[in-house]
Amino acid sequence: MSWKTYTVKEPTELTVSKYVKERFSLSSRDIQMMFRKKRVKVNSRVAHSQRALKKGDVLTLELPQDKDYGVDVEKGPITVLYEDAHTLVVNKAPFMLVHPAGQTKSCTLSNYIASYYAKKGVVHKVRPVHRLDRDTSGCILFGKTKEAQQYYTDELQAGRIDSIYTGLVEGRIDADGMVDVPIGVDPVFDNRRVIDEFGQSAQTEYTVLGYEGDKTLLRFKLLTGRTHQIRVHMEHIGHPIIGDAMYGTRNKPYTRQCLHASELTFVPYGKDEAIMITCEVGDNFGRE
């Protein structure tokens, strides 16, 4: 383990222990161990767990190493798009959950990534920075360390990670545009989202790329990151995503939801320059 230094950049009323727990998603046991072994300092002095932090304080700590992957290790195919010591970007296949949820404990992307780490002889908890819907394919970002995951979470919340999607929608759209309507949780089915004037603000830009008969191929840029945002917005303007069973209909000859995370732009943890990761739709949206 090595010491890491962070400056508290925002006003806070949290104690040192609460700040460290929230920022690095650590367990109470890990927090207690760190303070017991004097692995937390504030302004170069060993810190008490209940010390109040303030903006400008310099926090130095030794984070515990991962002891497991956080999910079951299961061999499966993954396509790596970018990797360094702190970061992993892969191409998620359609019909796959990013992380175990509910009754699904296996055959997820995270299970396969755990196997990928194990094969390389390293132990990292599998830490997805964001999610893609089960039927959506494309670029997805993982932080290998607690520090990298928190960095990317902060970057995402600050709008400094750009996500671009490619999608095929019903009907012909003649011009580029933007949908700017709030999204909330469906009052009946909590796994669905609906347009809701009291919901969270949501903005989706779209650019026309071309046409396939009476369908339009679009490039989407998310200005916000709400659950099912593109799918809900396109259904709202009368052009649902092809193959979207929840907000549209299944459409032959396409065998899956025609939405793909095609581009991700971000500054990697520990580096200064932004990179752009691209990933083409490899299966033509499963067209038969």
Across the structure, where does each feature detected by a protein language model lie?
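RNA pseudouridine synthases
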Residues: M1-E288
